[in-house]
Regions:
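Amphipathic alpha-helical dimerization/coiled-coil segments
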Residues: 70-92
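Short, Lys/Arg-rich nucleic-acid/phosphate-binding segment
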Residues: 56-62
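Key DNA-contact positions within bacterial/archaeal DNA-binding proteins
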Residues: 37
Length: 92
């Protein structure tokens, strides 16, 4: 296996949250292979950029995507975050 991945850490964090909107930062870090602090930073960047919204529900946070927001990649500007998630996340 190569030591690289097709998805950046930001993309992998998005996938973790798409699979479980209530996932904890510690769990994101474990799944992506980054520290909890790095997961916290990435989630904050996604919120600041308008791709993700966080809502406090009791003692936990719940995340929701802004699915119409365009991708930041110059080669994929015509696509939205929703388009990306539709391709990468299997829906039952």
């Amino acid at each position: 296996m190569p030591n690289w991945t097709f998805l950046s850490n930001h993309g992998q964090v998005l996938l973790c949250i798409a699979h479980d909107p209530g996932v904890r930062l510690r769990e994101i870090g474990e799944q992506v292979g980054i520290t909890e602090r790095a997961a916290h930073r990435i989630v904050g960047e996604l919120v600041d950029a308008g791709y993700l919204e966080r809502e406090r529900m009791g003692r936990r946070n719940h995340s929701a995507f802004t699915t119409r927001r365009g991708l930041p990649d110059p080669l994929a500007r015509e696509s939205s975050i929703g388009d990306l998630l539709n391709v990468l996340v299997a829906r039952p």
